[in-house]
Amino acid sequence: VSLHADRGELLAVVGPSGCGKTTLLELICGLQAPEAGSLQCAPAALMPQRDLLLPWLSAVDNAALALRIAHVPRTQARERAAKLFAELGLEGFEQSRPHELSGGMRQRVAFSRTLLSGKDVLCLDEPFGALDAITRAELQTWLLDALSMEPRTVVLVTHDVEEAILLADRVAVLSPRPGRVIASLEIALERPRKRTDPEIIELRERALNVLQMGIQR
């Protein structure tokens, strides 16, 4: 796989199941080592498909977990997490336990935890895949708002081609296993983007056609 992401870019990666999208994120985050080739990347944090919130911790303590692992004092870690909660629409839920939160709220807490890692690159693995359509659309907008306040380079893995086009600056399309980049689509459209925009529909069809051709080879 030959791939790059510019600083501050939101790069979406789409491809069929089993093509190596999650493995790619794990390589970027240093959780796996490449068997060949080279990888150059700024420090990166992974937000996995499941939120993995610890049930015995409050929302704010879950978000502050990366800071605590980095030996930031508990009070300071909570203060930083609470400040981010206020910015990201989580104010008032600081002391809630995970089971008291909706799926969308849990994902917001998980994203806050990833942000508080302080890494320059965020790797998001299907962050909205388990959510209903309405909540998913709300969180897509929320993600862009959050990144406008806390800019990062983002690599977003998704099975949803439309989601990729709505959110990303560029979409990399992978072939079936063994995954390789078979297309890179620049999304030079202003935000917010609407699903019904003719340009979005055209780009979605282009991406789906590339995916289909890759599967048939």
Please state what every model-predicted region is.
Residues L57-A64:
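Short coil-to-helix segment of the ABC ATPase nucleotide-binding domain corresponding to the Q-loop/switch region
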